[in-house]
Amino acid sequence: MAAPAVKSASTPKKATAQFLWEAKTKSGESKKGEMEAMDVEAVNARLKSLGLNPVKVRKKSMLDGDITIPGFGGVEGKDILVFTRQFATMIDAGLPLVQCLDILASQMDNPSFKKVLFAIKSKVEQGSTFADALKEHPKVFDELYVQLCAAGEVGGILDAILNRLAAYREKNEKLKSKVKSAMTYPIIVILVAIGVTAVLLLKVTPVFEKMFADFGSELPGPTQMIVNFSHMAQEYFFHVAGSIVAVVMSFTWSYRQPRGRKFWDKVFLFMPVFGPVLRKVAVARFTRTLGTMISSGVPILDALDVTAKTAGNRTVEDAIIYVRGKIAEGKNIAGPLAETKVFPSMVVQMIGVGEATGAMDTMLNKIADFYDDEVDAAINSLTAMIEPVLMVFLGGVVGGFLIGMYLPIFSLAGAIQ
């Protein structure tokens, strides 16, 4: 007869919580941070084991979290870039990791980033690795950052890795800034044109129409056309505005769905005018990310995993995942890259040469530098092409309206003479 089952321990494992603490060192210096523990007693015991005298310990509440409005008060790319540069310099100078984090957190102006850095410092003080502490803040430090720091810690070259990361982020921020500025200008001009047209049709035209009605004469064709457009705009304004909002919301919803994002990312990548610029940006980002990771000692399969996640375009991401699968099967990188038909043949050939000569990281970084310049040239060319078109469009809208509105006045003046 089987023995009765032994009853499992009746007391479940107690859940941990986040605690905020303040303490003093033996020299009287004040310290503060955040710690995960079972209770206040556990925090006090841990602080004493670190040579600190606890002053105040309390459980972290929801009110202690960062309350931020999207686009305001968050951690920006330039904040991370400056932190990485300074951190690399301090590590290179031989300062202990915890001291570096303490100094940088204390000097940080951004309150959100300050809290993150103090939390990371607290984790490291508790015995966590720097990379594991970073991993708990994925909205600030992406997987690329974490993986490279992990490689730097294992290899004892964290300062060199941080310098590479800083260089990578600096070039990446410049690339993003260029693309953003290129896209922002035409959008602003188009929005201004729409706003001006709306004001002219909804506010200005009715005033002129009332004045023309007093003349009692028939309106010229162009003027009548503008008046008809004004009537339509007034009658269907809310219908049009509602339709625009519905289209924007539908697109946003569609883009957030996996299939929708896959479709739209492919459309963006191969659409006229902007498509070639976006493809160059994708190549620059892919080669820069992969080159930085390989030169830092990250295995090729892990590097491709991270590169796929940071691609920024689903079509490019799927292509990188396909290439990774083929490499896992034992194939080289150039063949599968060519099969995706996403990357230019010149890029594929150069990567193939780099792989054959054992200098793929160097070749990838050279390709990235080349495509950074290509993006510059493409954006300058695009701006030079779009600028006069938009100016002519805006001038045509305003000029056409002015001519249409003043034609009856000129006709009336001619009749009086």
Swiss-Prot record:
Gene Ontology terms: cellular component: plasma membrane
Xref: InterPro entries: GspF/PilC, T2SS_GspF_dom, T2SS_GspF_sf
Topology with respect to the bilayer: Multi-pass membrane protein
UniProtKB keywords: Cell inner membrane, Cell membrane, Membrane, Transmembrane, Transmembrane helix
GO BP terms: protein secretion by the type II secretion system
KO phenotype (gene knockout): Deletion mutant show missing type IV cytoplasmic dome and disc but the cytoplasmic ring is still present.
One Pfam family named in its UniProt record: T2SSF
Protein's UniProt keywords contain Ribosomal protein: no
Compartment(s): Cell inner membrane
Domain of life from the UniProt record: Bacteria
Family: Belongs to the GSP F family.
Subunit structure: Homotetramer. Interacts with PilB.
Protein name in the entry: Type IV pilus assembly protein PilC
Organism from which the protein derives: Myxococcus xanthus (strain DK1622)
Lineage, opening ranks: Bacteria, Pseudomonadati, Myxococcota, Myxococcia, Myxococcales
Gene assigned in the entry: pilC
